[in-house]
Amino acid sequence: METRGRRRAFSHQQDEPEENPGKRPTRSAPLYRHRNQPNANPATLERHYPCSTGRPPTGTVQPKPSQPPQPRSLLDRDAIDHITELWDRLYLLRQSLEKMTMADGLKPLKHFRSLEELLSLGGERLLQDLVKENQHVRSMMNEVTPLLREDGSCISLNYQLQPVIGVIYGPTGCGKSQLLRNLLSTQLINPPPETVFFIAPQVDMIPPSEIKAWEMQICEGNYAPGPEGTIIPQSGTLLPRFIKMAYDELTLEQNYDVSHPDNIFAKAASQGPIAIIMDECMENLGGHKGVSKFFHAFPSKLHDKFPKCTGYTVLVVLHNMNPRRDLGGNIANLKIQAKMHLISPRMHPSQLNRFVNTFTKGLPLAISLLLKDIFQFHAQKPCYDWIIYNTTPEHDALQWSYLHPRDGLMPMYLNIQAHLYRVLENIHKVLNDRDRWSRAYRKRNK
């Protein structure tokens, strides 16, 4: 009864002292203990339990803020592939520039001696820039791929460009007449003409063998191989017409008027595409009689008047890139209106250099010198090859191209070469800055 009637001590009160006054009192009970605490006699806590109710917390109350994704290592497999691919291209371009005969006028560019040195000493920023540069080079290569065949050659010389006004420069014996026939027989002119006008100073100057070669090759260019050994016509006629004309017949007054009933070009244009070939007519073009109408005004009128005339081609042969005699301004106007310049590497170097200097204003000096070196290299070869400049190309990579009798029409990718040269200049700048900082550091710590 005494036990039941005894008052219960509160948790904040100290235990009653024992009878022995000399004995030290025991430690007081904990100030606070959670009801879910598994230990019945826990150690004394000098602070409150962090959780007031429920189970003990398993994590922080406030979630961590979202962090941006960490970038991948620059030396992963894709990055190394990009840098290796770009290194091969840069090495080839650098070797070509160093070995060409005109390399004396170029400033030397600092570079890494090997790919391993680039990967180890290039630095994070430079390696990242090189990866981006190679991705850009790949994109430029992929853009031009639909315009090429499987072997890398061009599908066409003009693609959808109309009218086709071309000038062929070459000395005697470089294969200009054969080039004219090959352009039509290999279907590099799109669409293939149904009527070909061959203009010469005199009709008697054309040998019978050349006439027969023209008739055979324009017929060959009118067909393409089909399935199961068949051939498919590429125009609206089975046999294209070949018409021989003297230069004096070309300049008749009736042929300047599209609406004239006796205009021979209008009659042919009413049936389909036409082509006008002027061979050995440089002296006649330099006379007083103007024929520049056939280069600019005539094509648009034929296209408007005759819907079947979907193609208009004019190819003019010149033996000199800068003839002195041009009384009527025909040659000067022809060069302005020309969309394509087909140049033989056997032309005089002074004329080639003048042409390259005029039409490579947007390219680095090193690429212009490289183009001149290409002309000089092919001038020493016996092949009947040509270098073509297109003023309005389908793609920048096709602005300069190389025509070989066996390989076909191959793009020269001078836009990509110019981009690679700028990458070489960037590497030179990085290495030059490092050398300057190293010299400044050594000078300061002396």
Curated annotation (Swiss-Prot):
Primary location class: virion
Binding annotation for ATP: 170-177
Annotated region described as Disordered, given as residue ranges: 1-74
Induction: Expressed in the intermediate phase of the viral replicative cycle.
Keywords (A to Z) from UniProt: Activator, ATP-binding, DNA-binding, Host nucleus, Nucleotide-binding, Phosphoprotein, Transcription, Transcription regulation, Viral genome packaging, Viral release from host cell, Virion
Subcellular location: Virion; Host nucleus, Host nucleoplasm; Host nucleus, Host nucleolus
Region described as DNA-binding: spans on this chain: 439-446
Disulfides per UniProt: none
Keyword Transcription annotated: yes
Presence of keyword 4Fe-4S: no
One CC-aspect GO term: host cell nucleoplasm
GO terms of molecular function: ATP binding; DNA binding
Domain of life (superkingdom): Viruses
Compositional bias (Basic residues): 1-10
GO biological process: DNA-templated transcription; nuclear capsid assembly; regulation of DNA-templated transcription; viral DNA genome packaging via site-specific sequence recognition; viral release from host cell; viral transcription
Family: Belongs to the adenoviridae packaging protein 1 family.
Record note on quaternary structure: Homodimer. Part of a genome packaging complex composed of packaging proteins 1, 2 and 3; this complex specifically binds to the packaging sequence on the left end of viral genomic DNA and performs packaging of the viral genome. Interacts with protein 33K.
Protein role: Component of the packaging machinery which encapsidates the viral DNA into preformed capsids and transcriptional activator of the viral major late promoter (MLP). Binds, along with packaging proteins 2 and 3, to the specific packaging sequence on the left end of viral genomic DNA and displays ATPase activity thereby providing the power stroke of the packaging machinery. The activity of packaging protein IVa2 is stimulated by protein 33K which acts as a terminase. May be the protein that pumps DNA into the capsid powered by ATP hydrolysis.
Protein's UniProt name: Packaging protein 1
Species for this entry: Human adenovirus F serotype 40 (HAdV-40)
